[in-house]
Design a protein with these regions (language model features):
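Beta1-alpha1 glycine-rich phosphate/pyrophosphate-binding loop at the start
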Residues: 2-73, 157-183
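FAD-site-proximal beta/loop scaffold in flavoenzymes
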Residues: 120-143, 222-226, 230-290, 294
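C-terminal auxiliary extensions adjacent to catalytic cores
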Residues: 322-358
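FAD-binding core/adjacent interface of flavoenzyme oxidoreductases
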Residues: 2-3, 70-145, 228-230
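Conserved N-terminal Rossmann-fold NAD(P)-binding element of oxidoreductases
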Residues: 9-11, 105, 149-150
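A Rossmann-like FAD-binding core segment of flavoenzymes
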Residues: 75-82, 98, 166-256
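Internal hydrophobic alpha-helix adjacent to the cofactor/substrate pocket in enzyme cavities
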Residues: 19, 284-311, 317
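Rossmann-like NAD(P)H-binding beta-loop-alpha module
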Residues: 134-168, 172
Length: 358
């Protein structure tokens, strides 16, 4: 078993921000490792542009080894199979065991797949991004009609990015499109989707797949052979057996200090964590990075921790697939190429800020 003073499990947005800060200033004392499934971290905000061909794969990812080297952190490649929260031991899929005096979890979430009967329909999830790209390359060789599940920002952006690449596209969401965002943003998104020929079905939750049919309740609502999942985040199965306290949906319950409610020596951020007033979004994970960095440093040095104050509102920018973007802020919305340039600048800046030479 390999032991560390601190293990950063997962190369999510918050952990990238922590590593960047430690590369620029002094990091906490002790042996620190970053555990990641692969040598790169993908920036999900650029996925629609990547799928639509506006970005190359190299534009959308951060090489982890240079960043870890600059932060004086060991890069450990491996996938988590189990976690014992009481002992803070991570069991990896290849049999290795890692133990941390402190742990920080930024491991994202999986995607909920509707129960499927038969194998007539191919199902592809929007994450992990590497598998999405592999599957999408195969689908591109023979374009067919397709459905997308997910009426959030990710589903809308993917629908607009793919509208010109498939013969017919349908977008299904269980509630209202872009629920919780500015009403004007929803109307603008609906207009763009309809203009691009996307069939939008609101308040149409998909409960199961039977052969090549999508069913809402007992009603068949769409027939085809390709389904892209862009909604329905679910915790990784190993979290349920970890002894960590969780919310009703199974996500890790955390305190304002970003510590797990049940285990103070384990921090959790991003999509895997649940805090009152915090929505699961990459934008919020980025904003957790400064507090997480400060609190990990304080924890290793025995100092008091800071509280993270979750934001109820944030700027929403949705790529429209043609170089433009839709913007939403509180009850105000706008759209156009100017906002697309602004979104591109923000996305490219994020990737550039976390790239280190060498």
């Amino acid at each position: 078993m390999t032991q560390y003073d601190l293990i950063l499990a997962g190369a999510g947005h918050a952990h990238l921000g922590v590593l960047r800060r430690w590369a620029l200033v002094e990091r906490p004392p002790g042996r620190i490792g970053l555990l990641s499934p692969g040598p790169e971290a993908w920036y999900a905000g650029m996925l629609p542009g990547l799928i639509s061909g506006r970005f190359s794969p190299a534009d959308c990812r951060v090489e982890l080894q240079p960043l870890c080297r600059a932060a004086k952190v060991e890069l450990i490649e491996g996938e988590i199979a189990a976690l014992d929260a009481d002992t803070r031991i991570l069991q990896l899929a290849d049999g290795r065991q890692l133990q941390g005096e402190w742990l920080s979890l930024n491991v994202g979430a999986g995607m909920a797949i509707p129960p499927q009967q038969g194998d007539a329909m191919q199902v592809l999830a929007a994450r992990p991004i590497e598998r999405l790209l592999e599957g999408w390359q195969q689908w591109q060789s023979e374009p067919r009609r397709m459905a997308i599940l997910g009426g959030g920002a990710g589903g809308v952006e993917l629908a607009l990015a793919l509208a010109d690449q498939v013969p017919a596209l349908a977008l299904f969401c269980g509630g209202s499109l872009l629920d919780g965002l500015a009403p004007g943003l929803r109307l603008r998104a609906l207009g763009h989707l309809r203009q691009r020929g996307v069939q939008v079905r609101e308040h149409c939750p998909i409960g199961r797949i039977e052969d090549d049919w999508l069913l809402s309740g007992d009603e068949p609502v769409w027939r085809g052979r390709r389904l892209l999942l862009a909604s329905g985040a679910r915790p990784w199965p190993w979290l349920a057996a970890s002894q960590l306290s969780s919310d009703a949906a199974g996500f890790i319950a955390i305190r304002p200090t970003l510590q797990c409610e049940s285990h103070a020596q384990i921090f959790a951020v991003g999509d895997s964590a649940s805090l009152d007033g915090m929505r699961r979004s990459g934008r919020f994970a980025v904003r957790q990075a400064p507090v997480l960095s400060a609190n990990l440093q304080a924890a290793l040095q025995g100092r008091p921790l800071r509280a993270y104050r979750a934001q109820w509102q944030s700027l929403a920018l949705l790529a429209t697939g043609d170089g433009g973007a839709l913007l939403g802020w509180h009850n105000w919305s706008a759209g156009g190429q100017l906002y697309g340039h602004y979104k591109d600048w923000l996305d490219r800046r994020f990737v550039k800020r976390h790239r280190m030479v060498g």
